[in-house]
């Protein structure tokens, strides 16, 4: 597909099999991005957390090194696309240092995406897609998104509209 616009073709939000709801390996996605004339492709699987919480939609912490290596291989294999290392992360205040110091710092992630799959409400984490069915829950969701943005850890928020929950 020819891009006649002055706006570059980019994708900053993508998932591989590691998210448990997608398929494919990083290099396959980047090759497809190249074939579609994308200039920039951000690989952004759901973040692993050191305590492996919410394992049904994210990779385990022990998979993190393999994930980073898969992105590095794709960067070398498809040099015509700028491949960025990222993760889509729940904002869990107790893991701010992990996100800032380990992912953005030590492991040199290019950026992080904020995610609102889970919402803290009265001491528990509710699924944002199935449990936000009353005003107090929605208020908690909005407050949590605001805290996420105020943390300045994330470049943008993925699907803040909690799609699929109407």
Tell where the protein language model's regions lie, with residue ranges.
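An N-terminally biased module of ancient metal coordination in phosphate/nucleic-acid-related enzymes
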Residues: 1-93, 98, 164-166
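Extended substrate/RNA-proximal surfaces in nucleic-acid metabolism proteins
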Residues: 54, 61-166
């Amino acid at each position: 597909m020819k891009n006649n616009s002055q706006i570059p073709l980019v994708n900053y939000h993508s998932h591989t099999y590691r998210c448990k709801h997608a398929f494919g390996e990083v290099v396959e996605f980047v090759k497809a991005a190249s074939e579609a004339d994308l200039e920039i492709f951000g690989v952004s699987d759901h973040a692993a957390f050191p305590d492996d919480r919410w394992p049904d939609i994210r990779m385990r912490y022990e998979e993190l090194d393999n994930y980073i290596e898969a992105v590095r291989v794709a960067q070398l294999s498809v040099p015509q696309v700028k491949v960025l290392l990222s993760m889509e992360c729940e904002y869990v205040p107790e893991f701010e240092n992990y996100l800032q110091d380990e992912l953005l710092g030590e492991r040199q992630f290019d950026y992080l995406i904020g995610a609102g799959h889970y919402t803290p409400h009265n001491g528990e984490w509710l699924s944002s897609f199935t449990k936000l069915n009353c005003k107090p829950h929605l208020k908690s969701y909005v407050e949590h998104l605001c805290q996420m943005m105020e943390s300045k850890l994330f470049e943008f928020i993925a699907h803040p509209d909690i799609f699929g929950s109407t």
